[in-house]
Amino acid sequence: MRRAEALAALRVLDIRPADVQFLALPDQGLTDLLLRDCDRALTRITRVIDDWSPTDILAPSLFDIHPDHNAVAVMMRLIFADFSAPRISQWNYLVHGRSAAFFDRSAELSSSESETAKKREAIRCHRTQIKLSKRRFLRYAARPERFLRVERESAVRRDGAVYSVSRAHDNLDVDLRFSVDPFRMPRNKFFILGRDSLGRTRACQIRLPSRSADLKVLDCATNRSVGIARYRGHPFAGEFTLPLHLFSPIHDLFIKVDRRSWFFDEAGWIEIPGVPSLANVAPSMISAEAYSLAAR
């Protein structure tokens, strides 16, 4: 049903079925896939990119608050960390949310009246998806499109509950500020994802408490304890230090505070650049301060 609706919408936009390829990834399940078993999905997407040889790729933003959207965004970052494709331009778009980290830096592309009408017609093709929120989805057609070019130097931004984060070679310091939301407060989790020393994807989670405590760091794939994080805080703010022995220091990390309410996250993922190799960087540049992302 959803696939037929998608094809109908694409026909409205003059895209032929022969130019469409579906990946059959799980609806409302991409965050779980990302955290527990994403390597096969990454391989499939990489093959599609290699086969199609695109000049531009448009993908969801890390800052989109739909958990499926921001999970795909992380997957694309992981793929292009390994994929040598200098001629491919990457662009992100945001459907859900109002993240300043996206809107302050994205470029606006206005639509003509005929283009807006076509977008409305395409949206109406997704009957099962818009059944409960038709007006909201149709309003999306009237707003300008916005795209943010993916660039290495602009990868890291604070967002949502993450007030600041500082990465050193062996640990990660995170400062959190929580909004007062009774629907989110009881379910706070912290996710961290990266590569291990062999280049494999690893993900861990911590259940955030309402007071200071030593917390188990759990491997998302096995649910086994792999370390201890020291948390200091209260229901509205906190900070903790997370050991990074499972993760390669030269690869980027992705972190997210999971405060989901109904379908949507409070915020998406934040990308944290890898620490340069000690063999290639002068000692004076290795301090944790060099990687501090705190707002001053």
Which stretches of residues belong to each language-model region?
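Active-site beta-strand->loop->alpha-helix modules in alpha/beta enzyme cores, enriched
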Residues: 1-87, 121-125, 131, 137-140, ...
